[in-house]
């Protein structure tokens, strides 16, 4: 949620309703009003509704709900003589600009709007930075966005003397906060007049030359950043809300010096989103029609048409939160009012049941016990020195070094158990089922959870065949006719180990433990171990069902 503070009387005057009605309508827009004092209110707004971060944006939305204005808001747009030349700025390559004439907006609210955009779509100015200037104080019709050396001088905002950019970085609060974002190789991005005078060094600070005051009604707006889409969306939102305050939007010609491309800014990015009537009915659980759907869309300040039975929603430039069909459905719900959406009566009797993986794990445990093995249970955390693979999850701040990693196999835990129970009566037959975390480059984190089962035998004399027979019995009891392919790894004796396959899919490993591994764990007797991949087994058995 994003919090803004507004003068309630100024806001209510724009929409001509009472405070309680305002609170009710804002609740429909997933916003909450809290009084601060006699004059001011605090409004919590969903972070995706950037169009509501000023009183004019809120007024536009509420006029739609009141049906005073329907569909996309239309604004006066004119061409200007202003040109923005975008040079090769390596740290923030994208820039757009616009002019707004005769916008009647409170200065304090405008600054708040700017900073809230910085904190949301701007990612604290790392992605997008906004410069708003008093157009009367801009001397040049041609503005250039380029890199300048840190020795460049200008008077920064709220200062009374020239400073170099280096001094601004060292001495000003803005320089300390944002200087590391865009400064590189001894240069800084800058918005510069054709006479060389700096208007701003985004994303750090504006020049005091174009400082806004209470009499400012004409604005020059520059938006720079690392994402062209975010830059364009931000500028569209700003000029739309300023135009809602009575302003006229002026287009600025933007020239890209690197490839001589040209465009007119702002872009007024629109998109068409098709909406299915049945989908709306299913999600909201209501009876409706295409015409009724369009009516609600229009109340949410978007255009809607029905073409050949298809509902086509035109998403305007200020609604950057609408990404796909479900977002339009959510807007329809807001228009209807969440309190007016009654749950349908649904009578059903359902019974809980075990997850298939739980049932499979239980079956494997029963088969292990039936084969003469005793079940043990180790911790999921383990000492990293006991693991055989170097691809594992390391605990950043472990309470003890004994548990500083997440196990990626059950085998180390079984070997550790055997090392501590060499005094017990032979043969020792134990098994464990449980979770491990294994490396997987296809996942977002690089790792995934896996379910496994492992079996071990330790005796004065034990061989591969002693473990292979019960494992084959367990897998056959599950309905899997597997085969074994010789495969060597550092855990087992070469030539006395294999991988277990079912239809070319690896289901586990089996073998006689390498003497070097036994010495590493302090085990004085031979041992054999098998590990089954329950997750893979479950996939195969599920396909057979």
Swiss-Prot record:
InterPro entries: aa-tRNA-synth_II/BPL/LPL, B3/B4_tRNA-bd, DNA-bd_dom_put_sf, Phe-tRNA-ligase_IIc_bsu, Phe-tRNA-synth_IIc_bsu_arc_euk, Phe-tRNA_synthase-like_B3/B4, Phe_tRNA_ligase_beta2_arc, PheRS_beta_core. GO terms for biological process: phenylalanyl-tRNA aminoacylation. Its main location: cytoplasm. HAMAP family: Phe_tRNA_synth_beta2. CDD domains: PheRS_beta_core. Tetramer of two alpha and two beta subunits. SMART domains: B3_4, B5. One of its GO terms (molecular function) is phenylalanine-tRNA ligase activity. It is found in: Cytoplasm. Transmembrane segments: none annotated. Gene3D superfamilies: 3.30.56.10, Bira Bifunctional Protein, Domain 2, Phenylalanyl-trna Synthetase, Chain B, domain 3. Mg(2+) binds at residues 321, 327, 330-331. Keywords: Aminoacyl-tRNA synthetase, ATP-binding, Cytoplasm, Ligase, Magnesium, Metal-binding, Nucleotide-binding, Protein biosynthesis. This is Phenylalanine--tRNA ligase beta subunit. GO terms for cellular component: phenylalanine-tRNA ligase complex. Residues 268-343 form the B5 domain. It catalyses: tRNA(Phe) + L-phenylalanine + ATP = L-phenylalanyl-tRNA(Phe) + AMP + diphosphate + H(+). It comes from Saccharolobus islandicus (strain M.14.25 / Kamchatka #1) (Sulfolobus islandicus). It comes from the Archaea. Its cofactor is Mg(2+). Belongs to the phenylalanyl-tRNA synthetase beta subunit family. Type 2 subfamily.
């Amino acid at each position: 949620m994003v919090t803004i503070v507004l003068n309630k009387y100024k806001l209510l005057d724009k929409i001509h309703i009472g405070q309680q009605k305002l609170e009710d309508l804002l609740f429909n827009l997933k916003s909450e009003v809290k009084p601060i004092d006699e004059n001011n209110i605090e409004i919590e707004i969903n972070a995706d509704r950037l169009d509501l971060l000023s009183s004019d944006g809120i007024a536009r939305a509420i006029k739609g709900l009141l049906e005073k204005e329907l569909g996309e808001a239309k604004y006066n747009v004119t061409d200007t003589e202003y040109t923005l030349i975008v040079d090769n700025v390596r740290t923030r390559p994208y820039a757009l600009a616009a002019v707004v004439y005769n916008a009647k907006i409170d200065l304090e609210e405008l600054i708040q709007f700017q900073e809230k955009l910085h904190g949301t779509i701007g990612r604290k100015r790392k992605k997008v930075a906004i410069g708003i200037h008093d157009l009367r104080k801009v001397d040049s019709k041609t503005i250039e966005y380029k890199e300048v050396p840190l020795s460049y001088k200008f008077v920064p905002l709220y200062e009374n003397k020239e400073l170099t950019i280096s001094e601004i970085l060292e001495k000003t609060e803005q320089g300390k906060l944002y200087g590391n974002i865009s400064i590189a190789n001894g240069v800084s991005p800058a918005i510069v007049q054709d006479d060389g005078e700096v208007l701003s060094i985004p994303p750090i600070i504006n020049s005091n030359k174009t400082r806004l005051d209470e009499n400012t009604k004409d604005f020059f707006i520059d938006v720079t950043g690392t994402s062209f889409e975010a830059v364009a969306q931000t500028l569209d939102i700003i000029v739309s809300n300023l135009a809602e305050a009575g302003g006229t939007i002026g287009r600025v010609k933007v020239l890209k010096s690197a490839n001589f491309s040209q465009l007119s800014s702002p872009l007024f990015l629109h998109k068409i989103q098709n909406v299915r009537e049945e989908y709306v009915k299913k999600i909201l659980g209501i009876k409706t029609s295409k015409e009724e759907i369009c009516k609600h869309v229009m109340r949410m300040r978007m255009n809607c048409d029905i073409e050949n039975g298809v509902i086509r929603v035109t998403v305007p430039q200020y609604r950057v939160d609408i990404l796909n069909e479900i977002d339009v459905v959510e807007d329809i719900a807001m228009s209807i009012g969440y309190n007016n959406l009654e749950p349908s009566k649904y009578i059903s009797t359902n019974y809980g049941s075990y997850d298939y993986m739980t049932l499979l794990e239980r079956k494997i445990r029963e088969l292990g016990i039936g084969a003469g093995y005793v079940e043990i249970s180790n911790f999921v955390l383990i000492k990293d020195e006991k693991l055989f693979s170097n691809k594992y999850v390391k605990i950043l701040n472990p309470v003890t070094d004994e548990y500083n990693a997440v196990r990626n196999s059950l085998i180390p835990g079984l070997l550790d158990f055997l090392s501590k129970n060499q005094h017990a009566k032979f043969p020792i037959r134990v098994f464990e089922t449980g979770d491990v975390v294994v490396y997987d480059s296809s996942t977002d984190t690089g790792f995934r959870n896996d379910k496994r089962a492992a079996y071990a035998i330790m005796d004065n004399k034990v061989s591969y065949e002693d473990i292979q027979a019960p494992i084959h019995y367990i897998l056959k009891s599950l309905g899997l006719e597997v085969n074994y392919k010789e495969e060597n790894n550092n855990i087992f004796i070469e030539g006395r180990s294999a991988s277990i396959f079912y239809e070319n899919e690896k289901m586990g490993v089996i073998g006689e433990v390498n003497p070097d591994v036994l010495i590493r764990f302090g085990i004085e007797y031979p041992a054999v171990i098998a590990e089954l991949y329950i997750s893979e087994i479950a996939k195969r058995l599920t396909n057979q069902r």
